[in-house]
Every structure is written in structure tokens, then in C-alpha cells.
Amino acid sequence: MQITLLKGKLHMAKVTQAELWYDGSCAIDEEFVKLAGLREFEQIEIYNVDNGERFSTYVILAEAGSRTISMNGAAARKVQVGDRVIIAAYSQMSEAEADSFKPRLVYLDKDNAVERTTNTIPVQAA
């Protein structure tokens, strides 16, 4: 049986651009793409923490080191520059593969600097 698990995410990324007339996609700093284990043209889910919007698009590369998170095309209507978003990618795998799988989690600060990377999320306290 195949199950779907979180593969990688950028947590609390700040939207730096919203380009309505650019080809639809999400441009992400190439360094962030590598840290989160994402790929160019990979499908991603975007969760807008500021307005609750949730939508799908795909990754395109932005200049490495630029800290760019740009929502393009129709996705630009779902955000405002400055919004904080979670960008997530998922992967299907067997249960046996899932037993040893670890996601790549990248936490960003308010300026899109990497705060930390990890492969676990602490248990939520009651």
C-alpha cells in the first residue's frame, strides 16, 4: 500500500513578490529549494497563514541567495506581499519506506533568513 507523507516544507516564508502577469508558479530562492529537497516544476501546496488561502502550484527557481518567494500568475491573487506562507511538498511511498523516511523542514524568519532545518516536529503539548 502507498501512503502520502510530507516530503519537505518551507515554514513561515514571507512573500516577497506577487506577479500577476508572470507565468503561473511560485518562484523560490534556489537555496531554499535545495534545503527543502524540492525540485524545479514540482507540485507544491501553499498555505497562507495570514488569510487562510490554500492552493496548489509548482516550483520555479529564483536566484540563489535572493530570499525570493514570488507568487506568480493566478496565485498572485491569493497573497499580498508580506504574507507568511507554508510551502509544502508531499511524496507517495510504501509503508516500509515511510518507516525510515525523514522530511526536510526549513524554518524561515521574518526576513526569509533560514532559522533552522530539521526533520522532526515536536509533539504538540495538550
From Swiss-Prot:
Pathway listed: Cofactor biosynthesis; (R)-pantothenate biosynthesis; beta-alanine from L-aspartate: step 1/1
What InterPro entries does this protein map onto?
Asp_de-COase-like_dom_sf, Asp_decarbox
- What processes in GO biological process is this protein linked to? alanine biosynthetic process; pantothenate biosynthetic process
Residues modified to Pyruvic acid (Ser): 25
A Pfam cross-reference name: Asp_decarbox
| EC class of the enzyme, as a word | lyase
Per the UniProt entry, the Enzyme Commission number(s) are 4.1.1.11
Alphabetized SUPFAM superfamilies for the sequence: ADC-like
Q: How is it modified after translation?
A: Is synthesized initially as an inactive proenzyme, which is activated by self-cleavage at a specific serine bond to produce a beta-subunit with a hydroxyl group at its C-terminus and an alpha-subunit with a pyruvoyl group at its N-terminus.
This protein's UniProt keywords:
Autocatalytic cleavage, Cytoplasm, Decarboxylase, Lyase, Pantothenate biosynthesis, Pyruvate, Schiff base, Zymogen
Subcellular location per the Swiss-Prot or TrEMBL entry: Cytoplasm
User: Where does the record place the catalytic residues?
Assistant: 25, 58
* Keyword Lyase assigned: yes
Q: Which cofactor does it need?
A: pyruvate
CC cofactor note: Binds 1 pyruvoyl group covalently per subunit.
Membrane-spanning ranges: none
Q: Which GO terms describe its cellular component?
A: cytosol
Quaternary structure? Heterooctamer of four alpha and four beta subunits.
Report the protein's function: Catalyzes the pyruvoyl-dependent decarboxylation of aspartate to produce beta-alanine.
Q: Which NCBIfam families match?
A: panD
User: Family per UniProt?
Assistant: Belongs to the PanD family.
The family database entries (HAMAP family) matched by this protein are listed as: PanD
- The identity of this protein, by name, is Aspartate 1-decarboxylase
- Native source species: Saccharophagus degradans (strain 2-40 / ATCC 43961 / DSM 17024)
- What gene name is given for the protein in this entry? panD
